[in-house]
């Protein structure tokens, strides 16, 4: 692998530290939670020159105290001043490392698939600079700082504070939202999920391995010496909560999150290679209901796209995926423009990693899920030296999948009969209204016998003679819908008695037959798996008495046959409609653009991206029961009753800190669950937290609740003047007008991820 010199002595300059300080100052509300500039303004220009020279010589002294944000709230001590200096140095190091690894990892040493999939983990800076600062000379390895042209123009930065704020907010606040956004476009036929949490036990072995990662790309060992000092002082650590945004660690440690992603990057490469070699998207085979036109497409596919002539069953080895990857792409394009239904075998894996949390979506059998689980967990233990816990496998139809504190559910698209079942109650109500109007009309008529004859005549001949009349068409539709629901079995026996077209009846029969074949296929796989397992167990007993080489070879052949039996790993998909083919084709292109250009304000989108956004197969919901338990553990709600109480943990702090802590928590909740469908129901929990804040203030001052209302008003306003109003808690008007996805991040507060991830 090609190595280059990172050359810390040339990169760390006073201009770089000045830019790091200026960027933190513009984005200080995201990281520090203070409302004064006393610490930022106390840093002089000479400090940048002195610090850069000390870092180059290796004499810079790092603070020995962990970063605590609550110390910042109380006073501006010398200890906090040293911690701020460390944040400036840490941010400067991150600027160098991030852009260096963009070029070295994702351009020279990676294939195209890995580059596309992982480029969003590190490439945040370049697109924002290119958009906001088009005249700025920028390099992938490291953008140069020009003393006279850019850095000393303080007015330029002051006029572009929004750019710096957008840069920090998009990079560090929307990674979880991007993970949920990616899950929305997974395949709708996913049947099983697997969640996993990696235990971050950082020791000497991991530190040496991280050092070896640096040595692969650079021979500048002096750079890692400075990083090793940070690890020894616990200022940077990938095994602690420093990787999360929280209220206890000064926002977060940016280097800790970066090093964790860099360390687990090899695991992402392993997953990409495994998916590329083992999994396939679709394989065709001929079905029972094959018409002449369908058989033509089938024969055309066998001749042009698939190298093997397939009859009833076929096997696909992993190496065929590499040889015929282009043909699989062409077959998707071919069937895109032909509205034909065909049947497929499918086997694919979808996954998303957020720091040390992973979720997998499987389009395969359960045998393949356990096979993949053993492979990946073996890789984590033996290659990355990481352990794991909380490995759970969920069925998408029965179980509630929870990832990052959010429920994942299907965005179901109902067919004709499912709509009738869902709306059965509505149909019955309409039917009762029609009967009521019918009875009222009967009473109004004088000649009941004459009316009954007319009504029976209309009822028998409403279709097709009087179909255009609104009342009779509604009556006919709802009565027939109700009959279909009640006599579903008779619907398939006496099809000529119903008004539905023949094509719909034929397609319905086809769907039910394919559902039955799917069930029989799964049953066949299970019986075959049990049979092979029994054979292996019997051969184990036989080998205990005989150790002939032929027996060993036969045993190995049976074991390999069971291991490489593709039918046991595939998922049988009987219905692969034109809608799903076309949208999957578009979503494949959309996923490419998402991984390449996410967080870049929608730049460089292809033709398919804008159309694919409306086809989302998964929804997210707030788990209110889990969230209620979290509120009780944090002390906002009574442990046994459903009512707010005063938080005992905050009684010793000042009122300003209490108000800010409650507001910080509420904004974190609104940020995290802004993507959920039931986001509007969070208003009730926000009001509970508001009442808990009032009760906490009353308990601290030993006053009545009316006293807190009179002092801080109902919106918890800390101070109010003619020109400025300081309020850390969202107002009631803001909460009432808040809608889903309309709230992203408030400029005054950071995001506390430890509430949802622990």
UniProtKB/Swiss-Prot annotation:
Record keywords: Chloroplast, Plastid
One Gene Ontology term from the biological process aspect of the record: homing of group II introns
Record carries keyword Disulfide bond: no
UniProt keyword Transferase present: no
Compartments where found: Plastid, Chloroplast
Domain of life: Eukaryota
GO cellular component: chloroplast; mitochondrion
GO MF term (any one): RNA-directed DNA polymerase activity
PANTHER family the UniProt entry points to: COX1/OXI3 INTRON 1 PROTEIN-RELATED, NUCLEAR INTRON MATURASE 4, MITOCHONDRIAL
Protein name: Maturase-like protein 2
Organism: Euglena gracilis
């Amino acid at each position: 692998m090609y190595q280059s010199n990172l050359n810390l002595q040339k990169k760390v300059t006073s201009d770089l530290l000045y830019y790091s300080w200026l960027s933190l100052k513009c984005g200080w509300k995201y990281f520090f939670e203070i409302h004064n500039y006393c610490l930022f303004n106390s840093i002089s220009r000479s400090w940048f020159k002195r610090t850069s020279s000390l870092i180059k010589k290796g004499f810079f002294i790092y603070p020995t105290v962990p970063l605590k944000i609550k110390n910042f709230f109380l006073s501006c001590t010398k200890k906090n001043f040293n911690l701020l200096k460390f944040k400036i140095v840490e941010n400067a190091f991150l600027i160098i490392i991030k852009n260096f690894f963009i070029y070295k990892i994702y351009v020279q040493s990676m294939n195209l698939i890995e580059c596309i999939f992982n480029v969003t983990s590190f490439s945040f800076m370049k697109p924002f600079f290119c958009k906001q600062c088009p005249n700025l000379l920028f390099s992938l390895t490291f953008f140069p700082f020009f003393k006279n042209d850019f850095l000393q123009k303080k007015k330029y930065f002051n006029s572009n504070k929004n750019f710096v704020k957008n840069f920090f907010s998009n990079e560090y606040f929307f990674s979880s939202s991007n993970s949920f956004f990616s899950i929305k476009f997974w395949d709708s036929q996913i049947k099983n999920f697997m969640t996993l949490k990696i235990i971050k036990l950082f020791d000497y072995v991991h530190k040496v391995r991280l050092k070896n990662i640096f040595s692969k790309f650079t021979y500048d060992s002096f750079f890692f010496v400075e990083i090793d000092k940070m690890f020894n002082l616990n200022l940077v650590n990938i095994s602690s909560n420093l990787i999360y945004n929280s209220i206890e660690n000064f926002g977060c440690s940016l280097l800790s999150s970066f090093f964790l992603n860099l360390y687990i990057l090899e695991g992402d490469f392993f997953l990409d290679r495994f998916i590329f070699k083992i999994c396939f998207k679709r394989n065709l085979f001929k079905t029972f209901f094959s018409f002449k036109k369908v058989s033509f497409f089938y024969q055309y596919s066998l001749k042009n796209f698939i190298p093997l002539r397939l009859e009833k069953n076929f096997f696909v080895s992993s190496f065929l995926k590499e040889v015929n990857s282009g043909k699989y792409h062409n077959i998707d394009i071919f069937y895109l423009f032909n509205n034909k239904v065909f049947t497929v075998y499918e086997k694919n894996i979808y996954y998303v990693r957020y720091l040390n949390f992973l979720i997998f979506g499987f389009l395969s059998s359960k045998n393949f899920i356990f096979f993949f689980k053993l492979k990946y967990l073996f890789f984590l233990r033996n290659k990355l030296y990481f352990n794991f816990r909380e490995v759970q496998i969920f069925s998408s139809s029965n179980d509630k999948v929870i990832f990052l504190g959010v429920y994942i559910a299907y965005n179901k698209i109902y067919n004709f009969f499912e709509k009738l079942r869902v709306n059965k109650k509505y149909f019955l109500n309409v039917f009762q209204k029609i009967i009521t109007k019918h009875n009222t009309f009967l009473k109004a008529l004088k000649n009941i016998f004459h009316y009954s004859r007319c009504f029976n005549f209309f009822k028998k001949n409403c279709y097709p003679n009087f179909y255009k009349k609104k009342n009779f068409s509604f009556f006919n539709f709802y009565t027939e819908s109700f009959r279909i629901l009640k006599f579903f079995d008779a619907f398939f026996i006496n099809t000529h008695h119903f008004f539905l077209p023949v094509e719909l009846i034929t397609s319905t029969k086809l769907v039910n037959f394919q559902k039955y074949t799917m069930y029989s296929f799964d049953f066949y796989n299970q019986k075959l798996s049990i049979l092979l397992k029994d054979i292996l167990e019997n051969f184990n007993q036989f080998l205990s008495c005989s150790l002939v080489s032929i027996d060993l070879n036969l045993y190995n052949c049976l074991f390999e046959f069971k291991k490489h039996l593709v039918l046991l790993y595939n998922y049988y998909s009987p219905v692969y409609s034109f809608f799903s083919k076309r949208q999957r084709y578009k979503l494949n292109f959309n996923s490419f653009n998402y991984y390449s250009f996410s967080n870049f304000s929608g730049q460089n989108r292809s033709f398919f991206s804008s159309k694919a956004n409306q086809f989302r197969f998964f929804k997210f919901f707030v788990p209110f029961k889990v969230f209620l338990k979290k509120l009780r553990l944090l002390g906002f709600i009574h442990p046994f009753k459903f009512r707010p109480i005063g938080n005992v943990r905050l009684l010793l702090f000042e009122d300003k800190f209490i108000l800010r802590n409650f507001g910080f928590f509420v904004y974190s909740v609104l940020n995290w669950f802004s993507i959920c469908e039931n986001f509007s129901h969070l208003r009730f929990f926000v009001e509970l937290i508001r009442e808990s804040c009032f009760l906490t203030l009353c308990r601290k001052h030993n006053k009545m609740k009316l006293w807190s209302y009179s002092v801080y008003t109902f919106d918890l306003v800390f101070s109010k003047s003619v020109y400025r109003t300081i309020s850390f808690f969202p107002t009631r008007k803001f909460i009432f007008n808040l809608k889903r996805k309309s709230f992203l991040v408030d400029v005054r507060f950071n995001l506390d991820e430890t509430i949802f991830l622990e």
